């Protein structure tokens, strides 16, 4: 059964913890602002789940139960926790793994279902073939640790990362066994066809991020406000056998955050999520 969640970064965007400038082991994504306001806004919009960055769990590291209680008091579940890393620098992986271990522990203690990993650094000289092999092996290690903690790991292709364009995605997924978090707007903005990517990796589809896109400006928009064929995309998700959290993410949107969340949920509530070919 499909359930709908919303990413907290719609209210405040994303920054990084400052220690990461000099210490790879301390870098976390963070949405600035009042996380409790965001929880309330997502619940008020009608969603039943929330996704947030691992860095937003750091203030609750010693009191995670209080955070979980606040989420549950608003009728929400933690659908996922999002993180990222470099992956490609072999001599830095020990420090990166220490950070991932901390991140995984936080996500597991919070009761998250999905553990979403973005990133993969791009060198100043560009992407190298060996970087995909190095990143793929690293992602396998992180995925194994996440699974051992009871999480469902997936990799999220993203603009500006090692896996931006379709051939980048193919190169990375040939080198790793981690599942796919299909962010349909990032895939499209990177030059890909979300339907084709989901179909190609249907047996590895582990999680879904939905947002709409204006192809002309590459602006991310509420569902139904852009030019993606979201009905065809959702039909492909269903055809892949996926029946789990659908998380709406709207980073970088300049309109009203509360209204955008409600508009996207209204769109989803008018979509058919069943496959008529199935009994």
Regions found by a protein language model. Name each.
Residues 2-8, 50-52, 78-83, 115-117, ...:
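Hydrophobic faces of well-ordered beta-strands that scaffold small-molecule active sites
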Residues 24, 68-70, 96-99, 133-134, ...:
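Short, hinge-like loop/turn segments at secondary-structure boundaries
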Residues 249, 257-268:
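Short, hydrophobic-biased amphipathic alpha-helical segments
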Residues 73-77, 89-181, 189, 258-259, ...:
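Active-site acidic/histidine proton-transfer and metal-coordination neighborhood
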Residues 46, 173-180, 201-206:
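Glycine-enriched alpha-helix->loop->beta-strand junction motifs that scaffold or abut catalytic
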Residues 9-11, 53-55, 83-88, 120-122, ...:
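Active-site beta-loop-alpha junctions enriched in small/polar residues
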Residues 14, 18-32, 126-129, 166, ...:
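Gly/Pro-rich active-site loop or hairpin
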Residues 1-109, 140, 151, 265-279:
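N-terminal pre-domain/capping segments
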């Amino acid at each position: 059964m499909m359930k709908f969640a919303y990413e907290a970064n719609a209210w405040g965007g994303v920054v990084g913890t400052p220690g990461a400038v000099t210490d790879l082991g301390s870098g976390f994504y963070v949405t600035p602002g009042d996380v409790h306001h965001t929880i309330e806004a997502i619940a008020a919009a009608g969603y039943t789940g929330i996704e947030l960055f691992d860095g937003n769990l750091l203030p609750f590291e010693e009191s995670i139960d209080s955070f979980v209680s606040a989420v549950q008091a608003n009728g929400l579940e933690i659908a996922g926790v999002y993180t990222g890393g470099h992956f490609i620098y072999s001599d830095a992986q020990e420090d990166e793994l220490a950070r991932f271990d901390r991140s995984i522990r936080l996500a597991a203690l919070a009761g998250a279902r999905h553990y979403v990993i973005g990133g993969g650094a791009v060198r100043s000289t560009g992407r190298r073939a060996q970087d995909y092999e190095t990143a793929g092996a690293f992602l396998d290690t992180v995925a194994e640790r996440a699974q051992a903690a009871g999480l469902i790991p997936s990799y999220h292709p993203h603009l500006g990362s090692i896996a931006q364009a379709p051939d980048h995605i193919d190169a990375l997924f040939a080198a790793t066994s981690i599942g796919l978090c299909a962010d349909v707007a990032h895939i499209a903005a990177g030059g890909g066809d979300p339907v084709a990517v989901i179909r190609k990796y249907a047996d590895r589809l582990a999680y879904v991020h939905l947002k709409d896109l204006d192809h002309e400006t590459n602006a991310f928009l509420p569902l139904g406000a852009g030019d993606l064929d979201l009905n065809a995309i959702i039909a492909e998700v269903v055809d892949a056998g996926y029946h789990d959290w659908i998380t709406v993410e709207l980073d970088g949107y300049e309109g009203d955050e509360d209204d955008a969340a409600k508009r996207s949920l209204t769109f989803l509530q008018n979509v058919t999520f069943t496959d008529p070919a199935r009994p």
